Each structure stands twice: as structure tokens, then as C-alpha cells.
Curated annotation (Swiss-Prot):
Its EC number is 3.4.11.20. Zn(2+) binds at residues 391, 395, 414. It comes from Gallus gallus (Chicken). This is Aminopeptidase Ey. Its main location: membrane. Residues 73-967 are annotated as: Metalloprotease. Substrate binds at residues 355-359.
């Protein structure tokens, strides 16, 4: 292990030495640091002796970890007291990128935090998790008064591991209005757990390269250094990284200075960065790597795209570089606020838990969300890159410049970014019509969850969200997709210009500070008043009904009488809503509408029921509500109007806007699941698809028919269903075969490319021989010349899956080898997912075992791979057995804070529709109470509710559905 020293530049002290070599030297020189700081600033810390303490044990009685369970003790509460307010940190870290004598990767560091005492107190609580401290005078930290006076002495310190605090008890109180500095020296593990300061790896040739990187959100900055780790505790950060000289260090801000040191024959660089603006701990980031970058310095903001050298050399960063500048410019205009920092670094990491993270000025991504290679990446990969970039850059203002006060309002942060990502992406790719996709990707996806009694409001009470697992659980589809959908609705009824006006004043007023969601409502109300926007009530009164109660309404209209009413839409109409609502689950609903002859003015439904004469159109024409699905609600009609809409779809479907053709399908299927219309009416909405070539209606139908597949692919119903889908998709397959000159040309429009993929994937997966023969032929061509893949990137997922499904071990092994050597992560993702398409039980069982072996499947991909296996009818019971037998291992790896953990529970239970499976799920819950379910707790309750709903739905609809499919295919 390398040894030596570095020069630390802490506040008010220059030239204090912190050893970086052998443990004894580290301890001795750490004491020198503490002693010198005491001399300079009146330190408190006991006698000048040192020892080392770990996160679980200590060496002296003064630092023994507390075992007190009294909930009234401040250190047993999850939230910080408000007595202390941090103002600045100086953090120095040195990651060691080779294992130590214990075969562990570690980092060492010191941290100095200056804080203001706002209320006199004799207790300091600061977050710390899995850090080992070098004791100073027998204590974990030393305390100094900034003005040179003598601070109170420390009487006791310990690590409260449950609530993740370093606790310091003082012999006297800190004085109100006085500034203090807390200094600590620590060591942590540079683990591969994807949290805090962690280790990522990749291979270059046969050499393993190690990257030291970060993921602080939500509660993991405390795993990198002791800090007041709550979003409202904003401060200025000065970061210094000590790193091998052949590596580069980057952080939120530009490099301020760098110099080189020789320590025991190894060359180290000490890189200090400019101080950050006031910001939250969860947005801090630093990376030490041998990555390369491409850059654009033509504007006032330096833009760099970083990644593995091979990926950058192959041009995989060029698309992100091309689009980042225009997206930043778009948001500067949209927010009427200049980008707040001098640079924008974006880094593609080989190992990353989330999709991306909006660290201020240093955004981190999974490689598949930043890197793009035209030779390997599909149009879906390209859309993913531009939308994720737009999402993260949107946060640079909304979330970073102005930040939520606490995680109970996460929806405003993530929902807003999930909405405006479509606006930013549209500005970068204006020919794609990408804003329309929000209806399918966000609104309809989240409604499936929000129609459960186990859903939750967008905004929680602040006291409902406390523990790290509770915080992680808030990062769900409700926060992201419902938040986006509700804000889209708000922007629509205000108009985008008025919405932007309120947004801009909100950002200007709260820059570098924290807010609650009502602050945005106040600024939007000012814009409404200024522009005289007619509304039935205040912004707060309207929007509170959408944010403070879960769910959404179904609006039912009778076109014979003009009556319109609303009710809480639940997939299981017999379920009981236990969460109370002061609004009694009613909403103020903005309704847009049209008939064949005109488009009407927006109508507001403010009561449970009303009558609107404009809606009384009779039985000989149709009425359509919720144009472009701008409102977050479903629509039901009297049978006569449904018949008219179905007739219009049959005669000339293009008379109805394309988004609303998708709406008719999605509403009908979900109303049928809720027993508000017949299941045959829902199925009838798919008849016109034999003449439809647009993507959105087809995707809406496939999404809903997938539920039928999940419910019936283990029964005789699936045979008749397969014949029907073959009948409907064959014209689409033929249409795209002709349009693409036998699959050799790529359609120009984004939506057309997506629907070509639908045509291939549906035809192959439902057994159309011509499609499967195409897949086999393309696979064989590739097999004969591995270096020349003849399959177009857009079609690879479908073709690979079909080849694996219809092949055996030989095909699986070939695809596995290609996965291991894939040069682009988007290609590796396609191959990894295709491997789950096997119909061989033993192969899928082996693949499940691979998911818990990080040498075969990266940790970041483990849960999504299990999910894909579970989506396979052969793999589903295997995945369920695997989850149950490996729950402790999986929970230990992913349960506490993984964004994907809740999806794991949902995926493996999505087919459950029998009493036996319900009992298994209930037993699973009972058997694992001691371990817990962490961030999957709510997902488990939702799985139980879905299963009960599925049981009832299948009982009531199986025979009717079977008869309908048989009748539709009787002549085929």
C-alpha cells in the first residue's frame, strides 16, 4: 500500500500534515493536525492521545456506541435538531484504487465543517454512516470556535449506528450566534455497493480499471464524510481530492489548483476545486478515474462528456455533446435564468444504480443513458439519452438552485423534471413529436398504480418520511410520473406562458434556498392574477385536490342528457380506501372536449355531478372528452356514445386525434378491469387496429393486451388470444415490410420507427412464422460472420429474443458470448435481456444464479434481469422461487435504498391470479418480517392488492374473454 503525505488546506490553516501511509503514521500525523488546529482556533477535544474507532466498536469508554433505546433522545430520532446550521465544509479525500492487505478498497479523509449555532445547545449531531474515525484526544472529532475563543469541551462522543449519527456531548452549551468548526479524520470502505463514495470497475484489454465515484442521493453523503445530511442544510463545499497522478479528479466545480507529490515512490496529485455555491449535500459529487472526454468550449459554459476511453474514442459521447448545449440554452430561456455554474460535466459510469443523478455541475449516468453509438444503439436508446439528459439538466435549476425542504415533497422535484424533460428533448429533436409520448410513458403507466387503494398522495406529511428506506420508497412512479402528469395538466389549463411566468419568479425568489410545494402555487397564483386567467378557484384550492389525496377521478358523461359526474377510480371497485381525504376523493377537473363538428371551451367540473348542455349531443353523433389527454383522469360514456366512437374508429379512425385513439383503448380496458364497462367493449376497441399504422394506438393496445397475456398465458384462453393478435398484427407487419423495403430501410419518423419495432416484436412473440423465420435467418447470418451483425439496431431486441426463444442451449451460449464482449452498453443491454427469452427451465434457472454473481451480471443490472426472467411465462415461477429462497441476500444488496427494488416485487408477482398464489405471497410477507422489505414495503402491499383484484377479474371474465377471442377468429 502506498505511503506518504499530502498538504491539507483547511480553513485558516495551511501546511497541516495528514499522513497517508501506514496506520501508525496516519494516527500520529492526524494528531498533529488536530493539535495545530486547536492551537490556531481554541480547540476542544481532551488529551493529546489518539486511537482508531470503527463504526460498530470503539476503544475507550468515552466513545462507546450508545445502546439507549429511549425514543426521546435526539440521537434516536431520524431528523436533525434545528439548533445548528452548517455554512461551509472543507472535505479532503484520498481513494485507494488497489486493495489493501485485507483485500479491501478504502478511502481516507478529513472534513472540517463550519456551522452557526442558532439555539444554545450542549449536543452536536452530525450524520455519519460506515465511517471509521481516528480519535483526537480520545474523541471522534475536535471542536473549535471560529473567532478564536474557547469552545465548550467535549465530554463524550459515540457513533449511533441505527440513526447514522456521530454524537458529541459537550460539557457546556454552544452559544447562540457563534460560529464553530468541527474537524474529523476518518476512513471508509470504497465498496462496490453503488452508494455514497463507491467503486466502479471496467476492463481495458485484460486490465481491470477502478473508478472512485459517488451517489449521494438520498441519504448517502454521510457515507463519504460526516455532514448535516438533509436537503435544507445547504452549505458551501470546498473539495480536495488526492489521487494517483495518472488519474483525473473532477467535482461539481472547476479545478482551483493542483500539484504533485511523491510518496513512497508513487506519484499523487492533490487537486482542489473551487468552492461550490450554497447547495445540498445530496448534490455533491467527485470522481477519480482514467476516463477521457469530448468537450465544447464555444459557449460561456464548458461542456464535457466523460466515459471509458474506448467509448469516447469510438465517438459514443458525441450525441450527448451535440444535444447538451441546445438543451441548456432551452432551459435558460424556459427559466429566464442563466445556468448557475461555469461548467457542465456529464459522466457515463459502468456501475450506477439509478438512471442518472443531477449532481450540480457533475451529472452522473448509467452508460446507456449517456453514451450512444449509431452502429449499435436503437432509436429507443437515442430517445433515452436525450430525455435523461434533459431531465438531469432541468434539475440544475429546479432542484439544485431551488431545492425541496424535505423528501416529503420529492414529487415536485422529480415530477417537474419528468415533465419538462419532454420539453427539453423536444427542443433538441423537434421532428420527433416526443411530447406526445408522455401520455403513454408517464400518465397511463402511473395510473395503473394510482388506481390502487395502496397508492399514496403526491405530497406526504413531513413526519411520514424519516428513515433512509422511507426516503428511498418515495422515489416511485407516483413522484415521477404522476407528478409530471399533474404538472402537465396545470400548465395546460394555465397556458404554458403563464406557467413559465410563475415558474420564473419562483426560481428568482428562492435561488440557493429551499421551498415547500405551496411556494410554487403562490408564484403561479401571482401569474394567474396578473394575466387574468379565468379559473374556478385558486391554484392552491385546485391543485391541493390533486396533490394531497391519492388517486384520480373517472369522469362519466351521458350524451343523451348532458349529465357529467366524477368518482374515485379504483381498479377493484369492491376495495376499501383506508387513507382519509379532507376532499372526500373529489377533484376540480378541467375538461376539454370535441364533437365531429367542433372543439368546445374548457369545462370545469367542480362538484360531484353537474349538467352541461354542450355534452348533450344525442345518440347519432359522438362526444370526446379530455383532448390530447391533457387531464389526469379517465373518461366513461353512456353505451350510445361508446357505440358512436367505435363506429367512427371503424369507418375513419383518423377523424379522432391519434392521442385520443390511444385514450379510447386505454380508458376502455381500465374501465373494464374496474367493472365499469364490459370487457367485450374494451376488446372491441382493438378491432380497428387491423387498419391502423400509428404508434400510439398500437402501443396502448399492446400495453393493455399484455395484462390479458399475463392473466391467461397459463390457460386455454391464450390459444384463441394468440390467433386474434396474429390476425390484427399481420397487416401491420406487412405494412412495415413494404415501407422498409423488406426491413432494409429505416422509417424517418420516431413514432414510425417505434411501430416497426412493435410489428416485429409482436409478430415474432405471437408466433407468426414469417417473422420467426426472418429472425432465424438473420441470426444465422450473424452466426456465420460474427464481426458483421446484419440486424438493424432498432430490431435487435426483438430478433435476439425470438432467436433465443426458438433456439436452445447453443443459441443461448452464442448470445451470452456476445453479451460478454459487447463494446457498447446499449448492445449489452439488448443481449442481456434477450437471454431471458429462453423457454428452457434449466437455462433460466442458471441465469437467475448469474444475477447474484457480480462477475457475470453487474449489480446495477441484477434486479432488471430477474424482472425480465419473471416476465417470461416459463421463468415467472422460477423467479418467484428464487426471490423467496434468496430474499436475505437480495434485501441486503438492494432493499434499503435501491430504486429498482420495488419493481422487483412487482415484476415477480405480476401474473398472480389464484388463491394459491395469494397465500404464497401472504406467507412470503409473514416469513420475512424479521428481515423486512425496505424500499419495497409499499410495493409488497400493492402486489397483494393486485393479486386479489386479478383473482376476482379472472373469475368474472375468463369465459367471456375466451368466447370473444374465439368468435373473432372463427373464420381464420
Amino acid at each position: 500500500m502506498a505511503a506518504g503525505f499530502f498538504i491539507s488546506k483547511s480553513v485558516g490553516i495551511v501546511g497541516i500534515v495528514l499522513a497517508l501511509g501506514a496506520v501508525a503514521t496516519i494516527i500520529a500525523l492526524s494528531v498533529v493536525y488536530a493539535q495545530e488546529k486547536n492551537k490556531s482556533s481554541g480547540g476542544s477535544g481532551g488529551s493529546d492521545t489518539t486511537s482508531t474507532t470503527t463504526a460498530s466498536t470503539t476503544t475507550t469508554s468515552t466513545t462507546t456506541a450508545s445502546t439507549t433505546a429511549a425514543p426521546n433522545n435526539p440521537w434516536n430520532r431520524w431528523r436533525l435538531p434545528t439548533a445548528l446550521k452548517p455554512e461551509s465544509y472543507e472535505v479532503t479525500l484520498q481513494p485507494f484504487l488497489t486493495p489493501d492487505d485485507n483485500n479491501m478498497y478504502i478511502f481516507k479523509g478529513n472534513s472540517s465543517v463550519v456551522f452557526l449555532c442558532e439555539e444554545a445547545t450542549d449536543l452536536i449531531l452530525i450524520h455519519s454512516n460506515k465511517l471509521n474515525y481516528t480519535l483526537q484526544g480520545g474523541f471522534h472529532a475536535s471542536l473549535h470556535a471560529v473567532n478564536g475563543s474557547t469552545p465548550p469541551t467535549i465530554s463524550n462522543t459515540w457513533l449511533e449506528t441505527n440513526t447514522q449519527y456521530l454524537v458529541l456531548q459537550l460539557a457546556g452549551p454552544l452559544q447562540q450566534g457563534q460560529h464553530y468548526r468541527l474537524f474529523s479524520i476518518f476512513t471508509g470502505e470504497l465498496a462496490d455497493d453503488l452508494a455514497g463514495f463507491y467503486r466502479s470497475e471496467y476492463t481495458e484489454g485484460n486490465v481491470t480499471k477502478v473508478v472512485a465515484t459517488t451517489q449521494m442521493q438520498a441519504p448517502d453523503a454521510r457515507k463519504a464524510f460526516p455532514c448535516f445530511d438533509e436537503p435544507a442544510m445547504k452549505a458551501v463545499f470546498t473539495v480536495t481530492m488526492i489521487h494517483p497522478s495518472d488519474h483525473t479528479a473532477i467535482s461539481n466545480m472547476p479545478v482551483h489548483s493542483t500539484y504533485q507529490l511523491q510518496m513512497d515512490g508513487q506519484s499523487w496529485n492533490v487537486t482542489q476545486f473551487d468552492p461550490t455555491p450554497r447547495m445540498s449535500t445530496y448534490l455533491l459529487a467527485f470522481i477519480v478515474s482514467q476516463f477521457d472526454y469530448v468537450e465544447n468550449n464555444t459557449g460561456k459554459v464548458q461542456i464535457r462528456i466523460w466515459g471509458r476511453p474506448a467509448a469516447i474514442a469510438e465517438g459514443q459521447g458525441e450525441y450527448a455533446l451535440e444535444k447538451t448545449g441546445p438543451i441548456l440554452s432551452f432551459f435558460e430561456r424556459h427559466y429566464n435564468t442563466a445556468y448557475p455554474l461555469p461548467k457542465s460535466d456529464q459522466v457515463g459510469l459502468p456501475d450506477f444504480n439509478a438512471g442518472a443523478m443531477e449532481n450540480w455541475g457533475l451529472v452522473t449516468y448509467r452508460e446507456n443513458s449517456l453514451l450512444y453509438d449509431n452502429a449499435y444503439s436503437s432509436i429507443g436508446n437515442k430517445e433515452r439519452v436525450v430525455t435523461v439528459i434533459a431531465h438531469e439538466l432541468a434539475h440544475q435549476w429546479f432542484g439544485n438552485l431551488v431545492t425541496l425542504r424535505w423528501w416529503n415533497d420529492l414529487w415536485l422535484n422529480e415530477g417537474f423534471a419528468s415533465y419538462v424533460e419532454y420539453l427539453g428533448a423536444d427542443s433538441a429533436e423537434p421532428t420527433w413529436d416526443i411530447k406526445d409520448l408522455m401520455v403513454l410513458n408517464e400518465l397511463y403507466t402511473v395510473m395503473a398504480t394510482d388506481a390502487l387503494t395502496t397508492s399514496h398522495p403526491l405530497t406526504f406529511r413531513e413526519d411520514e418520511i424519516n428513515t433512509p428506506a422511507q426516503i428511498s420508497e418515495v422515489f416511485d412512479s407516483i413522484a415521477y410520473s404522476k407528478g409530471a402528469s399533474v404538472l402537465r395538466m396545470l400548465s395546460d389549463f394555465l397556458t404554458e406562458d403563464v406557467f413559465k411566468e410563475g415558474l420564473q419568479s419562483y426560481l428568482h425568489d428562492f435561488s440557493y434556498n429551499n421551498t415547500v410545494y405551496t411556494d410554487l402555487w403562490d408564484h403561479l397564483q401571482e401569474a394567474v392574477n396578473k394575466n387574468s386567467v379565468p379559473l374556478p378557484d385558486s391554484i392552491g384550492a385546485i391543485m391541493d385536490r390533486w396533490t394531497l389525496q391519492m388517486g384520480f377521478p373517472v369522469v362519466t358523461v351521458n350524451t343523451l342528457t348532458g349529465s357529467v359526474q366524477q368518482s374515485h377510480f379504483l381498479l377493484d371497485s369492491n376495495s376499501t380506501v383506508e387513507r382519509p381525504s379532507v376532499f372526500n376523493y373529489t377533484w376540480i377537473v378541467p375538461i376539454t372536449w370535441m364533437t365531429p363538428s367542433r372543439t368546445g371551451d374548457r369545462y370545469w367540473l367542480v362538484d360531484v355531478s353537474a349538467t352541461n348542455s354542450d355534452f348533450s349531443v344525442g345518440s347519432s353523433t359522438w362526444l370526446l372528452l379530455n383532448l390530447n389527454v391533457s387531464g389526469y383522469f379517465r373518461v366513461n360514456y353512456n353505451q350510445e356514445n361508446w357505440d358512436q366512437l367505435l363506429q367512427q374508429l371503424s369507418n375513419n379512425h383518423q377523424a379522432i386525434p391519434v392521442i385520443n385513439r390511444a385514450q379510447i383503448i386505454d380508458d376502455a380496458f381500465n374501465l373494464a378491469r374496474a367493472q365499469q364497462v364490459s370487457v367485450t367493449l374494451a376488446l372491441n376497441t382493438t378491432r380497428f387496429l387491423s387498419g391502423e399504422t400509428a404508434y400510439m394506438p398500437w402501443q396502448a393496445a399492446l400495453n393493455n393486451l399484455q395484462y390479458f397475456q399475463l392473466m391467461f398465458d397459463r390457460s386455454e384462453v391464450f390459444g384463441a388470444m394468440t390467433k386474434y393478435i396474429q390476425k390484427q398484427v399481420t397487416p401491420l407487419f406487412e405494412y412495415y415490410r413494404t415501407a422498409t423495403n423488406n426491413w432494409t430501410a429505416i422509417p424517418s419518423a420516431l413514432m414510425d420507427q417505434y411501430n416497426e419495432i412493435n410489428a416485429i416484436s409482436t409478430a415474432c412473440s405471437y408466433g407468426i412464422a414469417e417473422c420467426q423465420q426472418l429472425a432465424t435467418a438473420l441470426y444465422q447470418q450473424w452466426r456465420q460472420n460474427v464481426s458483421n451483425n446484419p440486424i438493424a439496431p432498432n430490431l435487435r431486441s426483438a430478433i435476439y429474443c425470438s432467436a433465443v426463444a426458438t433456439g436452445g442451449e447453443e443459441v443461448w451460449d452464442f448470445i451470452w458470448e456476445r453479451f460478454l464482449e459487447a463494446p457498447v452498453v446499449s448492445e449489452a443491454d439488448k443481449l442481456r435481456t434477450a437471454l431471458t427469452c429462453s423457454t428452457e427451465t434449466w437455462i433460466l434457472q442458471r441465469y437467475l444464479q448469474y444475477t447474484i454473481d457480480p462477475t457475470k451480471i453487474r449489480k446495477q443490472d441484477a434486479t432488471s434481469t430477474i424482472n425480465s426472467i419473471a416476465s417470461n411465462v416459463v421463468g415467472q415461477p422460477l423467479a418467484w422461487d428464487f426471490i423467496r429462497s434468496n430474499w436475505r441476500t437480495l434485501f441486503g444488496q438492494y432493499g434499503g435504498g435501491s430504486f429498482s427494488f420495488s419493481r422487483l416485487i412487482s415484476a415477480v408477482t405480476q401474473r398472480f391470479n389464484t388463491e394459491f398464489e395469494l397465500k404464497q405471497l401472504e406467507q412470503f410477507k409473514a416469513d420475512n418480517q424479521d428481515i423486512g422489505f425496505g424500499s419495497g414495503t409499499r410495493a409488497l402491499e400493492q402486489a397483494l392488492e393486485r393479486t386479489r383484484t386479478n383473482i376476482n377479474w379472472v373469475k368474472e371474465n375468463k369465459e367471456v374473454v375466451h368466447a370473444w377471442f374465439r368468435a373473432e377468429t372463427a373464420s381464420s
